[in-house]
A protein has these predicted regions:
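Short solvent-exposed coil/turn linkers within tandem alpha-helical repeat scaffolds
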Residues: 73, 122-123, 153-154, 170-173, ...
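Non-catalytic, surface beta->alpha helical segment in thiol-disulfide oxidoreductase systems
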Residues: 70, 102-141
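Thiol-based oxidoreductase modules, predominantly thioredoxin-like and allied folds used
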Residues: 30-34, 54-56, 68-94, 104, ...
């Protein structure tokens, strides 16, 4: 009986080991697909969501995403259930246009058919990245979700801001500006700490749309409306930058020098000095 008991224990151990060894091992790294069409077929065949990372070689935060977020075990584990794709947006420009990529990194969370659920615009650390993807896959915190919430709370400044940012990330700049302006109208004097940020977001969005004159005009309004604030300081520094982007380097240089004379101790001073040096080298 004793021998029989030991034999049964041994058989049980063998059975358990056999069952566990038959499980698919967890991935130890993310294997990125680089052929979008092949990845789309794989996602369709396996009925798995797609995580599509649009990057460029010069994008600093793209590299942080690679070296911090994508090597974290929590995020690596996602690749067992999701198809990860990497797209160099400056090489596959057609795909970048298809998804209306507005900046880098942009990570599009899509269904097995490639249709977007929502996107992560910019860098997120591992846990935040994981949680945001899971929410999108559940239909939560998406553009459609927030538009639905806004119907019940049309003056919710947080919802308006999130919706505007989501439109901007999709290159829908006019829609983004419309929602940012709603925030400014509801908080014109920045009493709720939303109005000034919304105005700053407007000039950033105008610049992304290459409306540099509009961006400069918005910056000037911030300087006039909120003098002595960090928002005004940032906006004044950006006037020179957008002037340079519009093609008038000499005027931009004058604006930068005027800024440094007025704000020598500003947190933006070093950044402005770098812009001055760059312009002086090229004029």
């Amino acid at each position: 009986m004793k021998k029989l008991g030991l034999l049964m224990i041994l058989i049980s151990i063998i059975v358990v080991f056999s069952c566990s060894s038959g499980k698919k091992p967890l991935p130890d790294k993310i294997v990125f697909q680089t052929d979008y069409n092949a990845a789309l077929k794989m996602a369709t065949d396996e009925h798995k969501p797609m995580i599509i990372d649009f990057y460029t070689d010069w994008c600093g935060w793209c590299k942080v995403l690679d070296t911090v977020t994508y090597v974290d075990p929590l995020v690596i584990g996602m690749s067992a259930d999701d198809i990860f794709v990497k797209v160099n947006a400056e090489v596959d420009t057609a795909l970048a246009r298809k998804y209306s990529i507005a900046g880098y990194p942009t990570v599009v969370v899509a269904g097995p058919d490639g249709r977007e659920k929502d996107r992560i615009w910019g860098y997120l650390p591992p846990t935040d990245f994981y949680n945001q993807v899971q929410l999108y896959l559940q239909g939560k915190e998406t553009l459609e979700d927030y538009l639905g919430r806004l119907k019940d709370e049309p003056e919710n400044l947080d919802y308006l801001s999130l919706i505007a940012e989501k439109f901007a990330s999709r290159s829908r700049f006019d829609d983004a500006i419309e929602y940012y302006r709603k925030i400014v109208a509801l908080d014109p004097d920045n009493e709720q700490d939303h109005g000034a940020d919304a105005m700053a977001a407007i000039y950033d969005t105008q610049a992304r749309a290459r409306d540099y004159e509009g961006a400069i005009a918005t910056c000037k309004r911030i300087v006039e409306k909120f003098p002595g604030t960090s928002e005004a300081d940032d906006a004044e520094a950006m006037i020179g930058y957008y002037t340079a982007r519009s093609g008038d380097s000499r005027k931009a240089l004058r604006l930068y020098r005027d800024y440094l004379e007025k704000h020598p101790a500003s947190e933006n001073a070093q950044w402005v000095k770098k812009r001055v040096a760059d312009l002086e080298d090229n004029i």
